[in-house]
Amino acid sequence: MDMQDFYTGHAFDAYEFFGAHTYFGGTHFAVWAPSAQHIAVETEIGTFDLHRTQSAVWECDAPGVQAGMVYQYWVRGANGRSVAHCDPYGTAMTLRPDGHSIVSDAPKGFADDKWMQERTKCFDKPLNIYEVHMGSWRQKEDGSWYTYAELADLLPAYCKKNGFTHIELMPLAEHPFDGSWGYQTTGFFAPTSRYGTPDELVEFVNACHKQGIGVILDFVPVHFAVDAYGLKEFDGTPLYEYPAAAVGQSEWGSCNFMHSRGEIRCFIQSCADYWLRVFHADGLRMDAVSRLIYWQGDPNRGVNGSTLEFLKGMNAGLQQRHPTAILIAEDSTSFPKVTAPVEYGGLGFDYKWDLGWMNDTLDYFKKTSDERRENLGKLTFSMMYAWNEHYILPFSHDENVHGKATIVQKMYGEYEGKFPQARALYLYMAIHPGKMLDFMGNEFAQLREFDESREQDWMVLKYPNHDDFHRYRRALNEAYLANEAFWSREYDPEAFRWLDCAHPELDACAIWRDGHDGAVLAAFNFGDTELADYTLTLPRAGKLTKLLDTDWQCFGGRTEKPKRLVGKACGGELKLTLAPFSGQLFKLV
């Protein structure tokens, strides 16, 4: 690493220099702490003083210190106090509540060359993401966590069977508080030891790639945990954070990174590069991007110019270094060109969560049938801006916590009546332009909100409503994967049209999606009464195949699945009978 690139914020490989690096017979330690008065590294075999270089870097060789040994820095800061800190660039840590770093060699064992060579950003491919919290997807009988290696035998196969293309893992970087779900970090380069070692994480990623499942990691570039052994006041001064409390503290009580400083930019973007390069992650979903666009995420306070420049520089560098990795923004603002390349004035992301679509859609499905007739615009409005960005439609963990209720519980009505509405909702999600993301448990209509301390309620699958819903979601995902009209022209406005959205009094609408080899269309009745003789005028005639009816008995509905689904010639008109709260999916070739 060129130190000038470190100070100016241009380096992406700071982890190659900083941190603990073993050599034959010992370990080299290096840490940046410009205002420190003295630093020593305490190891299992003794304490070693670091010496300060002219570049404000402290370093030393520690003979006899080997991989697997625990260490921490004692930093006497500018205020004269000595505080124990974990290594900012440490690549492994001990389990909370302990906060020591562990000397760790680079993980080995990847066997995914073919996957890495052939992966794409999926612009014209299916992208159906399963969001997972590793500690609570499944747990052992005694309530303990599965390890990365143990999950390698379970999670990729489950995703493959259920029609998901990628797993998105809530933050794996080491964090002290389970209830933060990983979003308040102390060890940015260290996979959490809750689930095992870095080598075991490699085993998990290998298993995913072997099954054809991509791995996207949540990445937190905005803020960090306030725990004293972490980054806060690392050298006795606000080094990684803003000195002013007005902008230095986030709404979550954590410390905001000072992105205007080159060394901090280098730290964050090197961390992003580390997860992509060392662990073969297929993408990063960047958390709380609105806080990087506007001061404290508030448009009324104006654009934060320095963080915008950081974001552009980081994304441009990551795109160059990892051209097939997927960069996703969790951004609730209307700031333009989030998914445009930096060279064209954009922020350089590949995708952006469509949180407007999510809010409007769920608000619509919370309403009674009568109220829906007056609010069809909540479903149609998203198409007014659908082509402005590359969107992902998210039903994330945020919509399953804090009293918001799970997706199925958000549906209007009582228990039995929620399931047909949820089936129609997910068909609407699939036919709407945009890639898809769904949080664990939604696929079998979990009723209980997310709790990081408990595994998902798999026992509900013994009840017919949940088992049928799970079967339906698998069939819908299979239809999505098998029919390229869902995704091959995802961001082409000419490939979409409303077949009907002009009769809100019917609680009905219909959508047409063109592909390269045919089309798919879906018709919906979001009302509580049967809709007979619902007639649609099609853009062209062809051979019609019914792919799916959300009201089929095999999915928990009342309609018997016909024995013959294919080969029906269709002119320019289609006449349907739609059950209450249902949708029907067709393919036309």
Task: Identify the residue ranges that each predicted region occupies.
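Catalytic cores of secreted or luminal carbohydrate-active enzymes
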Residues: N465-F486
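The feature marks proteins involved in alpha-glucan
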Residues: M1-H28, D49-E131, S136-G143, E150, ...
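Conserved, mostly hydrophobic/aromatic
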Residues: V31, Y73, V132, L169, ...
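Conserved alpha/beta catalytic core and glycan-binding cleft of carbohydrate-active enzymes
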Residues: P97, H280-D282, G297-E455, L481, ...
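Short proline/glycine-enriched turn/loop motifs at strand-loop junctions of beta-rich domains
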Residues: W32-H38, P539-G542
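Substrate-binding/active-site clefts of carbohydrate-active enzymes
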Residues: K114-P126, H133-V303
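C-terminal beta-strand-rich structural cap/linker in extracellular carbohydrate-active enzymes
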Residues: A67-M69, K561-V589
